[in-house]
Regions:
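NAD(P)+-binding Rossmann beta1-loop-alpha1 motif at the extreme N-terminus of oxidoreductases
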Residues: 1-51
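Short, charged/polar "capping" segments at the starts of alpha-helices
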Residues: 34-39, 105-106, 152
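Rossmann-like NAD(P)(H) cofactor-binding subdomain of soluble oxidoreductases
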Residues: 49-132
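Short, well-ordered alpha-helices that flank and scaffold nucleotide-derived cofactor binding pockets
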Residues: 17, 21, 83-87, 106, ...
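NAD(P)-dependent Rossmann-like dehydrogenase/reductase catalytic/cofactor-binding core
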Residues: 213-296
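Internal alpha-helical scaffold of NAD(P)-dependent oxidoreductase catalytic cores
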Residues: 87-88, 107-114, 119, 130-181, ...
Length: 296
């Protein structure tokens, strides 16, 4: 298939390099400042697919029809990224967002209509230099939740990711894919960022660990109002078994002084909690602590 990847950070770079190394036709769509220093190929160090050096062409604006458009930018960068990928150029491409949070899906549907296939990725991966991606988690797993009319096309995409060495499953429930990720991501990102410690450090801190698990249960209650039935025992196990050294992308952004995806990750939980009368005190406290850490 012909793939375009919008954004070449930890997630976009991983997807692009793995697919290109496996022989797929891949092009990157990059911001001007990233394109300026792009060396013409990706160097990937990955615990899942191994080390890869592969040439991948890049442009500043999508300039050709593709079959799949991966949206792999930060939520804070989405509006700028959309200006570089016109639906008129993308044609009939499946649009697969791998952003954190849930609110981006409705925005993408405003632009691309029924071609959006919501997705989620579980991975620790970061860009450490121009086109230099380091993926350190022992897993890199993608879930896709296509509408019925796009299921066969999504299954073909999943097959290509699997051929490239990444885990990919096609699920029936969009709500469970998006909220299932958020049930782990939000508590973990907020907890690790609030104390600037990796997973093991959070687990060793009784107060932060308690807040993290309580936040996870709050996310589950909110998720139920959106049609996602999540088993809290599964997500508690996931949080308590994160690799000891694993850090969240929010934690890394905070340490580097970059903009945080705080609204994208915590906003839907707090907003929908208020709308449905569901208390979210643990999530609120973690958000407060992240804000305090950000102000230092």
């Amino acid at each position: 298939m012909r793939h375009a990847v919008l954004g070449a950070g930890g997630v976009g770079g991983l997807i692009a390099a793995a697919l290109a190394e496996d022989g797929q036709d891949v092009i990157l769509v990059l911001r001007a400042e990233t394109l300026e220093v792009y060396p013409g190929g990706i160097h990937l160090e990955s615990e899942v697919v191994g080390d890869i050096d592969v040439d991948v062409p890049a442009v500043g604006r999508l300039d050709r029809e593709v079959e799949v458009l991966w949206v792999a930018v930060k939520a804070t960068q989405l509006e700028d990224a959309l200006r570089a990928a016109s639906p008129a150029v993308a044609g009939n491409a499946l649009v697969i967002p791998l952003l954190n949070g849930v609110d981006h899906v409705s925005r993408l549907r405003e632009v691309f209509g029924d071609l959006v296939v919501p997705g989620a990725i579980r991975v620790e991966s970061e860009r450490v230099g121009p086109a230099h991606i380091v993926q350190t988690s022992p897993f890199a797993a993608v879930d896709l939740a296509p509408p019925p009319a796009l299921r066969s096309r999504a299954e073909a995409v999943a097959g290509e990711l699997q051929s490239a060495g990444l885990s990919c499953n096609v699920r029936d429930s969009e709500a469970e894919v998006l909220w299932g990720k958020l049930a782990v991501l939000a508590p973990f990102a907020l907890a690790t960022s609030s104390v600037q410690l990796p997973a093991a450090g959070v687990r060793a801190d009784p107060v932060t660990s308690r807040l993290m698990l309580a936040s996870m249960r709050e996310v589950g209650e909110v998720a139920a109002t959106q049609g996602a039935q999540l088993d809290p025992a599964i997500y508690e196990t996931a949080l308590l078994n994160m690799p000891a050294g694993m850090r969240s992308s929010m934690q890394k952004d905070l340490a580097a002084g970059r903009a945080l995806e705080l609204e994208a990750i915590s906003g839907p939980i707090l907003r929908l909690g208020r709308e449905h009368g569901i208390p979210t005190p643990a999530t609120e406290e973690l958000v407060r602590r992240v804000g305090a850490a950000q102000a230092l």
